[in-house]
Curated annotation (Swiss-Prot):
Pfam families: Myb_DNA-binding, SWIRM, SWIRM-assoc_1, ZZ. Keywords: Activator, Chromatin regulator, Coiled coil, Developmental protein, DNA-binding, Metal-binding, Nucleus, Transcription, Transcription regulation, Zinc, Zinc-finger. Residues 662-671, 725-736, 780-800, 965-985 have a biased composition (Polar residues). One of its GO terms (biological process) is regulation of primary metabolic process. This is SWI/SNF complex subunit SWI3D. Ubiquitously expressed. Residues 1-55, 428-502, 591-814, 944-985 are annotated as: Disordered. One of its GO terms (molecular function) is DNA binding. It is found in: Nucleus. Residues 108-133, 839-900 form a coiled coil. The gene is SWI3D. Zn(2+) binds at residues 310, 313, 333, 336.
Length: 985
């Protein structure tokens, strides 16, 4: 039976294995392993006598378990001890899966580590860059004018709305001596003085050299600039490290007001900037920040409070009284008020309760409306008598009344609100004008055309008729004013072009900054979870947490990594003793003022010298110059109607005539060569324009050197007296540069025609100026060198007509190109610096506030623990008192107990007839009797027989004398009836 079972089990095992793995069917090895497995299974389950043969499912489960978990053994690895390999596919699958998981984990782990290491390296590089920038700032020369980042609004040429709001007296037009021009001149003078030497400390006495404005205006402007750190800002640490403590104290007293921005007060926050500060009441520049200790010291100097007496009973009611505002100096004490001891025309509602503070200055924090009304009433009655005013208010001291009156916003706030409307409206109009370029372009040509028309009328009246003998001379000189007119128009166009380019650049800059800021704002609102629509406006007040929304906007604007690194670096700077490191980290170099602001006298002197030389050399040629100018205008008006082919043909003829001998003198040729060499060797640069030469003036022959640069600077400053002289100078220089020569017949014809039709000439000049303004200076000056030398008459008109007809969108393309060129130049570096400074300041402020909160929490915790200790001590003292009381009661009870024991012993001794011991009353007996055995008789001493009980005696029988004597010897004070009472009990 046993063998059949084994064979059947082996057959079943072999069948199961063959069904799972067909490849192992012809091999005989699985039978032996199956049998061995069966024997092992029987050995494991041998304890169960009622178990049947193992099924196929159980065998498969056991084989899988053996395949996945190798058996633990100590013997040799034989075939009998090996795990059955009937399921190789399952074992291989498990092994391959484990290997794949291990390889996958090993593959992901290096990637994560690599990314982490990369982030760490980038962070270290960013911190190293910030520290390098900081070290560069620290090692910078102190002669460089640096300002804090929050002064990025400052501009040498413009007035910011912040300046208009802070100093409204210069912009509201209410004071004659205070205008925007006066403010700009004072500001630029002070800034220029400090910019030239940043190591100095500008004070009020240094402003005596300035002749513009009064002393108060100078002081206001200086303190405003000092407050913002534009002057007297020295962020660089001192080089001498061995200074003493006294030197540091002196330096701290003389520090600029700006350093207070980087120090955070514990008691109160930094107050906002006062719009109209009282500069006369400030002894030092630090007076802009109110000193909280001044009021306390002022209050400490106050004398005792005023005493008040009741009008009814004359009692002292200074502590608590009832005051009647209807009648002066009428006060009642509490008892009289409750008793109703006041006049018949008064009621209890007419009185107010007055309870002064315990000490001076305690009640200065809050002022009720009634107290404020009393203060104003007292000011009207007593004027400047503050003792009477304090007595009238009754609840405040004199110092408190004075301080409250100084802090009251009486009318300054309302005046400031009125003043703010004018600058805002002015800004809106300025923005509208700057954005509307067409209106600017229309107004400028009209003024130029009107001015030109007056000059042309005067010129046409003074033109003399040429004689027959001088026809050749007039024809030769008539070519010179043509070029002069052309150069004059080009000069006027160049003067207007920088204004157009400046307006376009500013608009492009504003658009670029606005787009980046709006993008950062949109992303910040999305990060906070606020769904924004194109129609809705962004407002931090709509957010659930406006503070976090603002922080997200600043981080988006500056960059998360840069903002975090800068905040950490600023927090690390808190370990220093002052805010010097913070000030040094957040500052930048202020750009130099424009050249025309630096040395305006130089250009004026140069132009004056040039005008003087021209007047001396051409004093006798002014009538001829005027006639030449009229002839040139007529030639230009005729050539505008000529086609391009005729112009080219005429140009060739004029060039051929020039090449003939005798057409031009050797002197003029030598002068022309010298002028050309001078122009080719010295490129033209303009001070007012920031564009390179190839943008403003692509043709060098078009732009003369000194002759054109000086009229460009001082063209608007020429007086009416020297105007003709300057025009003659320009025409003479242009005539030297012009080579061609017009024929005599054409010139005479054009001259006569210009005399006949002066209105057409003026109209043509106006159209030319209009086209020059609309198309820009680049189109006016874009004529090549050859056309300049070959076309003295039609060179300017032909390109203008062609440009106006062929490129109608030239202005839009030019504006687009300038926008693309200025986007890289006018980036948002200042905006990013401001955002970084704001985030760093917020981080430092939060760190300081966190420290203050921690200190306050620690202080409150300490006070709480101290209070608990006081309570515990109070409880322990109560327990000690209770314990002492208990001990006293216990001692008293113990004494009572001892007395009772003694009395009991005496009673027992008296009953037994034994003389009591001679011990003291408080001493215990020799043999104490337990309390539980009260009726047990006392044993007699050793050697004595137990006494017999007394014999009953008749009532009248006398007591033996021995007993009486024994009783007397004990010295007991108890009477005999007492013993009878005890015995009876």
């Amino acid at each position: 039976m046993e063998e059949k079972r084994r064979d059947s089990a082996g057959t079943l095992a072999f069948a199961g294995s063959s069904g799972d793995s067909p490849a192992s069917e012809p091999m005989p090895a699985p039978r032996r392993r199956g049998g061995g497995l069966k024997r092992k299974a029987n050995a494991l389950g041998g304890s169960n006598f009622f178990s049947s043969a193992p099924s196929k499912r159980m065998l498969t489960r056991e084989k899988a378990m053996l395949a996945s978990f190798s058996p633990v053994h100590n013997g040799p690895l034989t075939r009998a001890r090996q795990a059955p390999s009937i399921m190789p596919s399952a074992a291989d699958g498990v092994k391959s899966e484990v290997l794949n998981v291990a390889v996958g984990a090993d593959g992901e782990k290096p990637k994560e580590e690599e990314e982490r290491n990369k982030a760490i390296r980038e962070w270290e590089a960013l911190e190293a860059k910030i520290e390098a920038d900081f070290e560069a700032i620290r090692s910078r020369d102190s002669n460089v004018h640096v300002v804090p980042n929050h002064c990025g609004w400052f501009s040498w040429e413009k007035i910011h709305p912040l300046e208009e709001r802070s100093l409204p007296s210069f912009f509201n037009g209410k004071l004659e001596g205070r205008t925007s021009e006066v403010y700009r001149e004072i500001r630029n003078w002070i800034m220029g003085k400090f910019h030239s030497n940043p190591n100095i400390q500008i004070e009020l006495k240094d402003l005596t050299e300035l002749e513009v404005g009064d002393s108060e205006a100078k002081q206001e402007v200086m303190e405003f600039l000092d407050y913002w750190g534009l002057i007297n800002f020295h962020p660089f640490p001192p080089t001498d490290t061995g200074s003493t403590a006294s030197d540091h104290d002196d330096l701290g007293d003389k520090e600029s007001l700006l350093n207070s921005l980087y120090r955070f007060q514990v008691d109160e926050a930094c107050p906002p900037l006062v719009h109209k500060p009282r500069f006369t009441a400030q002894a030092t520049p630090s007076g802009l920040f109110p000193d909280p200790m001044a009021a306390d010291e002022l209050l400490k100097q106050e004398g005792p409070a005023v005493e008040y007496h009741c009008n009814s009973c004359s009692a002292d009611c200074s502590r608590k009284r009832y005051h009647c505002p209807k009648q002066a100096d009428f006060d009642l004490c509490t008892e009289c008020f409750n008793s109703g001891k006041f006049s018949s025309d008064m009621s209890s509602s007419d009185f107010i309760l007055m309870e002064p503070a315990e000490a001076p200055g305690v009640g200065s924090g809050k002022w009720t409306d009634q107290e404020t009304l009393l203060l104003l009433e007292a000011l009207e009655i007593f004027k400047e008598n503050w003792n009477e005013i304090a007595e009238h208010v009754a609840t405040k001291t004199k110092a408190q009344c004075m301080l409250h009156f100084l802090q009251m916003p009486i009318e300054d706030a309302f005046l400031d609100q009125i003043d703010y409307k004018d600058p805002i409206s002015k800004d809106t109009t300025d923005l509208a004008v700057s954005k509307d370029d067409n209106s600017v372009l229309k107004d400028a040509p009209e003024e130029a055309e009107n001015k030109k028309r007056v000059d042309e009328d005067e010129t046409m009246k003074e033109v003399p008729e040429p004689e027959d003998g001088n026809e050749e001379k007039v024809s030769q000189e008539s070519s010179k004013p043509g070029d002069a007119s052309e150069e004059t128009n080009e000069m006027e166009a160049e003067q207007k072009t920088p204004k157009l380019e400046t307006a376009i650049e500013e608009r492009c800059k504003d658009e670029a900054d606005e787009n980046i800021a709006l993008k950062a704002l949109t992303e910040a609102f999305e990060d906070v979870g606020h769904s924004s629509t194109p129609e809705a406006s962004f407002s931090f007040a709509d957010l659930g947490n406006p503070v976090m929304g603002l922080a997200a906007f600043l981080v988006r604007l500056a960059g998360s990594d840069v903002a975090t690194a800068s905040a950490r670096a600023s927090i690390k700077s808190l370990h220093s003793n002052s805010g010097m490191l913070l000030a040094t980290r957040h500052c930048y170099i202020l750009e130099d003022p424009p050249d025309n602001k630096k040395d305006p006298t130089k250009s004026k002197s140069c132009s004056a010298d040039a005008e003087g030389n021209d007047d001396n050399s051409h004093k006798d040629d002014q009538p001829e110059e005027k006639s030449k100018k009229a002839e040139e205008v007529s030639l230009n008006s005729d050539d505008r109607e000529m086609p391009d082919t005729d112009t080219g043909k005429e140009t060739q003829d004029s060039v051929s005539e020039e090449k003939q001998p005798g057409s031009r003198t050797e002197n003029s040729t030598t002068k022309l060569d010298a002028v050309q060499e001078k122009r080719s060797s010295k490129p033209v640069t303009t001070d007012n324009s920031e564009k390179p030469v190839d943008i403003i003036c692509p043709s060098q022959d078009k732009c003369s050197g000194k002759e054109l640069q000086e009229p460009l600077k001082d063209g608007n400053k020429l007086s009416s007296e020297n105007k003709d002289a300057s025009q003659s100078t320009v025409s003479q220089s242009a005539a030297d540069a012009s080579q061609p020569e017009a024929s005599r017949d054409v010139e005479m014809k054009d001259t006569l025609q210009s005399e006949k039709d002066p209105e057409d000439v003026v109209k043509t000049v106006g159209e030319k100026v209009q086209l020059a303004k609309e198309e820009g200076a680049n189109d006016v000056l874009s004529t090549p060198d050859k056309s300049v030398s070959q076309q003295p008459i039609g060179s300017a008109s032909a390109p203008e007509n062609g440009t106006a007809g062929g490129n109608p969108n030239i202005e839009g393309k030019k504006e687009k190109d300038i926008c693309e060129g200025t986007k890289d130049k006018y980036n948002i570096e200042k905006l990013k610096r401001a955002a970084i400074s704001a985030i760093s300041a917020a981080a430092v402020k939060a760190k300081n506030l966190a420290k203050q909160e921690e200190d306050q929490i620690r202080q409150l915790s300490g006070s709480l623990i101290e209070k608990q200790l006081h309570k515990l001590e109070a409880k322990l003292s109560i327990f000690n008192e209770a314990e002492s009381l208990t001990m006293r009661v216990r001692e008293q009870l113990e004494r009572s107990r001892q007395r009772l024991y003694h009395e009991r012993a005496q009673i027992i001794a008296a009953r037994l007839g034994v003389p009591p011991s001679m011990s003291s009353k408080a001493s215990l007996p020799t043999n104490r009797i337990a309390a539980n055995f009260a009726n047990v008789a006392q044993r007699p001493p050793m050697g004595m027989a137990f006494p017999r009980p007394p014999m009953p005696r008749p009532p009248g029988f006398p007591v033996p004398g021995s007993f009486v004597a024994a009783t007397t010897m004990t010295g007991s004070s108890d009477p005999s009836p007492g013993s009878d009472n005890v015995s009876s009990v």
